């Protein structure tokens, strides 16, 4: 299986790539930070393409470097700063936080899917792995809700080609690539990768347009 993994310059993206590689698949890593990306690609012995997935120009220029035929796209958006309670920040800070969250979380996924979605073979899959945020959160919570709704809508679009598209939302306490990286237990990150991998298998053919949560039930506090 040919797999494209974005966010390859983050620990979470690297973990996703490692999970697919260990399962015997051919992986291409994508990331904006050349140094971190090249280190990850060398350690995993996979191909790498330097590209900022929030930038249409960068994606257009890199398009010819991506595999011509893909079975799976794994989107790992970069972390974004959430201003939280707007009363504690200036209007400018809040605006920047929302724009940053939109670019990092939604546009990076939307633009990547638009750029290479036609490279997917029939029966392929798209999985986006993002941080889980509580309903009462700030910019990140609202933006990730927007992404989930977009994913749900795209299920109908890609379903005509037998392609599934889903989101894995992982709690901050159990993910890598966002915060407390060195303190996050590696087996937990690997569990997230295994869920992403499962969503690309024939056993998950009827799961599409969904957001699956891996958070030790954290959202139960907001139910």
From Swiss-Prot:
Enzyme class: oxidoreductase
BP term (GO), one: fatty acid elongation
GO-annotated cellular components: plasma membrane
Record keywords, A-Z: Oxidoreductase
Keyword presence, Magnesium: no
Keyword Oxidoreductase: yes
Enzyme Commission number: 1.-.-.-
GO molecular function annotation: oxidoreductase activity, acting on the CH-OH group of donors, NAD or NADP as acceptor
Binding site for substrate: 128
Pfam families: adh_short_C2
Binding of NADP(+), residues: 4-28
Family the entry assigns: Belongs to the short-chain dehydrogenases/reductases (SDR) family.
More details: Was identified as a high-confidence drug target.
Record protein name field: Putative oxidoreductase Rv1856c
UniProt source species: Mycobacterium tuberculosis (strain ATCC 25618 / H37Rv)
